[in-house]
Amino acid sequence: MAIYAIGDIQGCFEPFQQLLRLIDFNPGKDTLWLTGDLVNRGPQSLEVLRWVFQHQDQVEMVLGNHDLHLLAVSEGFGKIHRDDTIDDVLNAADGKVLLDWLRCQPMMLEGHGYAMVHAGLLPEWTISKALRLAEEVEFGLSGTRYREFLGRLYGNKPTRWTDDLKGVDRLRLIVNVMTRMRFLTRDGELDLSYKGELEGAPANLVPWFEAPNRRHGGTPIVCGHWSALGVHLDEDILAIDSGCLWGGSLSALRLDDKQLFSLPCQAYREIALATGR
């Protein structure tokens, strides 16, 4: 039995299937950990959702920002962006079944000596605290008032965590940290403005996994979200979004021995160049 963590798929169904063949995925024995952003921007979001739904006994996943965007739009919140490719899900006969299942997926999980979250964790959060905070969001998404909850997700504030945060501000910051974060300011505030490579980052920003005094050290964190970072593997951070959608690759990391498998996504590079993405 092997556990394979796979980075952001974002509707790139054909590369996903090719990657499963490359790793010789055996659904009778193996498990997939998906870092979130199953959907959007790629051409086959519906096919990805259907496959994961049909194989949910072999899959563990966390929600990403594009997954949450799909859920919000499906309930009439948020705006369809020019590059969104979620109409196939919204118009599908089985769309409601898939969306009801999707919104009940976790924000974070822990197991086999690892934790997984889409974007990252604040340095002051321990793993156990982060799991409790994730449950607060999961309760809102899966509860009877989930529509109200989805309608309040959008926004970039607040930017600084305190345990005294309550209500919408508290939940929005948890969501933004776990699904959108890349950088913090050097005094610990969430910064969502810069999305590029490490080398080009403003001097006042630090990548979340290099923030000082991180309290979640010791448990390796599997994450995605940051395609400009690419694959970044060190002792306790396993970032595996290698930018398939943008013509990079789709990557799988076998957690048992840290072997990396990458499938080039050249066709998507050509699409990106043609569309100016």
Curated annotation (Swiss-Prot):
Cross-referenced Pfam families: Metallophos
Alphabetical list of NCBIfam families matching this protein: apaH, PRK00166.1
Catalysed reaction equations from the record: P(1),P(4)-bis(5'-adenosyl) tetraphosphate + H2O = 2 ADP + 2 H(+)
Keyword Hydrolase: yes
Function: Hydrolyzes diadenosine 5',5'''-P1,P4-tetraphosphate to yield ADP.
Keywords: Hydrolase
Protein name, as recorded: Bis(5'-nucleosyl)-tetraphosphatase, symmetrical
Gene Ontology MF, one: bis(5'-nucleosyl)-tetraphosphatase (symmetrical) activity
Family (UniProt): Belongs to the Ap4A hydrolase family.
Gene: apaH
Organism of provenance: Chromobacterium violaceum (strain ATCC 12472 / DSM 30191 / JCM 1249 / CCUG 213 / NBRC 12614 / NCIMB 9131 / NCTC 9757 / MK)
Source superkingdom: Bacteria
Record-listed E.C. numbers: 3.6.1.41
